[in-house]
């Protein structure tokens, strides 16, 4: 239910708020609120502020204690509350082709509610997945959002929400402004205040293992593009290799059966298709790694498929790449892959939400997305082409061959000899002491470092 004069003094922010705002942006947002008022309702459940954290900070900075609030009519899930938070901010960014209008506003001012029949617009506008996600929450929880429109009916802010209201045939909350103030409102509303930020959220890295694919089972329909396009045409049976982060290990198992000297290591190997970690298998793989390094040295090539898109922090990304560098001898080959930021842009450009799956991502300034499911945060990392190339420069990788497309990227790089012991030690401590369910850790960093020590000057 919408309340236009709700007491906000008792509201507490959700711990999972995935939005960060610095002091400069907060000051600019406060100026916007002072000049325009609060044009979009906050979203509340009980005394919990579900969405609108930064606007509430701005209101309190200005000493304002009452504001427009939409109170959710029923219990929610944390998953939905996070989606509210993301969409409450995400709807600020319209695609520009909505051509959305609302009739009957000529004598209105401030907040009003209109029927869906008064809304018109381009229902084939871009950002179809934004509308789909908004509509799902509207159907479950009622008309929680709003838009800004002129008295002549032009929607100038949050047009995607207005189109979703028309889709779902639900009432639309509109903040109506005089036509002469359109330019002023747009100058404030089109600015970005704060950024998505997921670094403070809980990390249970072993959860990422649930994304492991059975690559060569079920008819081999999930083959690895990195293996098929870059690795297999180059690696020979004689040199030694290792697949780091091998998931279920299908490719390594298949190639060993064909005579390849290819070890593999997965720190969170699952037992079959279940969700239980096979800690004994992981320890056996680490034992083999330690013995291999001690008796034969570093590897001629290293493969790391779809690991960098599953890291959950900048530190984890650095650690993975540094361990790859340590595993591969100087002059050897490293093959690795990840997901492209272009995939996000492609989704936002789509005019129809054809898939039943949620494909909408809100990316933070480090390239991470976060999805809350089953009590845990799941992360994905997306890279631009330039970011991938910069990672190679930082880690001393010379790109020999690269494949970049709108969804993924794949690299074959040549390793140099610039690795320091201090860097490798830090990375190994991170990777081989990652937490496990129940509060324990992998606990094998000392063994791995002892094997590496004679090999790194």
Regions found by a protein language model. Give the residues of each.
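A structural alpha-helix within SAM-dependent methyltransferase catalytic domains
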Residues: 30, 256, 321-325
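A conserved beta-strand element that flanks and buttresses the S-adenosyl-L-methionine
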Residues: 303-306
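A short His-aromatic
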Residues: 309-313
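Local beta-strand N-terminus motif with an aromatic residue
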Residues: 238, 299-300
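Short, charged/polar connector segments at secondary-structure boundaries
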Residues: 1-177, 181, 186-194
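A short glycine-rich, Lys/Arg-flanked "PGG" loop and its adjoining helix->strand segment in the class I
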Residues: 318-333
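Class I (Rossmann-like) S-adenosyl-L-methionine-dependent methyltransferase catalytic domain
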Residues: 83, 120-127, 172-293, 333-457
């Amino acid at each position: 239910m919408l309340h236009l004069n709700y007491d906000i003094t008792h509201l507490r922010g959700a711990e999972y708020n995935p939005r960060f705002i610095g002091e400069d942006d907060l000051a600019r947002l406060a100026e916007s609120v002072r000049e325009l008022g609060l044009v979009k309702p906050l979203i509340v459940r009980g005394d919990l502020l579900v969405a609108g954290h930064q606007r509430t900070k701005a209101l309190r900075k200005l000493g304002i204690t009452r504001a427009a609030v939409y109170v959710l009519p029923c219990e929610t899930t944390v998953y939905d509350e996070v989606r509210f938070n993301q969409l409450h901010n995400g709807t600020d960014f319209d695609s520009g082709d909505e051509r959305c209008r609302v009739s009957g506003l000529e004598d209105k001012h401030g907040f009003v509610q209109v029927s869906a029949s008064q809304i018109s617009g381009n229902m084939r506008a871009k950002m179809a997945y934004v509308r789909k996600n908004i509509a799902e929450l509207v159907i479950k929880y009622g008309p929680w959002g709003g838009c800004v429109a002129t008295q002549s009916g032009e929607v100038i802010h949050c047009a995607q929400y207005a189109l979703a209201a028309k889709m779902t045939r639900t009432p639309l909350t509109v903040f109506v402004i005089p036509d002469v103030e359109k330019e002023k409102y747009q100058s404030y509303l089109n600015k970005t205040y704060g950024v998505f930020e997921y670094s403070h959220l809980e990390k249970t890295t072993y959860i990422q293992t649930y994304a492991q694919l059975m690559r060569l089972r079920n008819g081999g329909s999930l083959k690895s593009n990195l293996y098929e396009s870059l690795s297999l045409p180059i690696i020979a049976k004689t040199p030694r290799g290792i697949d780091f982060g091998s998931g279920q290990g299908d490719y390594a198992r298949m190639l060993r059966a064909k005579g390849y000297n290819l070890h593999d290591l997965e720190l969170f190997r699952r037992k079959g298709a279940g969700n239980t970690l096979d800690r004994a298998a992981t320890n056996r793989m680490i034992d083999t790694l330690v013995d291999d390094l001690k008796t034969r040295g570093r590897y001629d090539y290293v493969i790391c498929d779809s690991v960098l898109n599953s890291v959950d922090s900048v530190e984890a990304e650095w650690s993975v790449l540094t361990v790859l560098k340590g595993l591969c001898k100087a002059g050897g080959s490293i093959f690795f892959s990840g997901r492209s930021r272009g995939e996000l842009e492609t989704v936002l450009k789509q005019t129809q939400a054809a898939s039943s799956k949620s494909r909408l991502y809100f990316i933070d300034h480090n390239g991470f997305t976060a999805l809350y499911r089953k009590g845990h945060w799941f992360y994905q990392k997306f890279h631009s082409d330039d970011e991938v190339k910069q990672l190679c420069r930082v880690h001393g990788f010379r790109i020999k061959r690269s494949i970049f497309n709108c969804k993924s990227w794949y690299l074959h790089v040549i390793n140099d000899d610039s690795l320091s012991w201090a860097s490798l030690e830090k990375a190994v401590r991170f990777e081989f002491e990652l937490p496990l369910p129940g509060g324990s850790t992998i606990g094998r960093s000392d063994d791995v470092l002892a094997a590496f020590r004679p090999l790194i000057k």
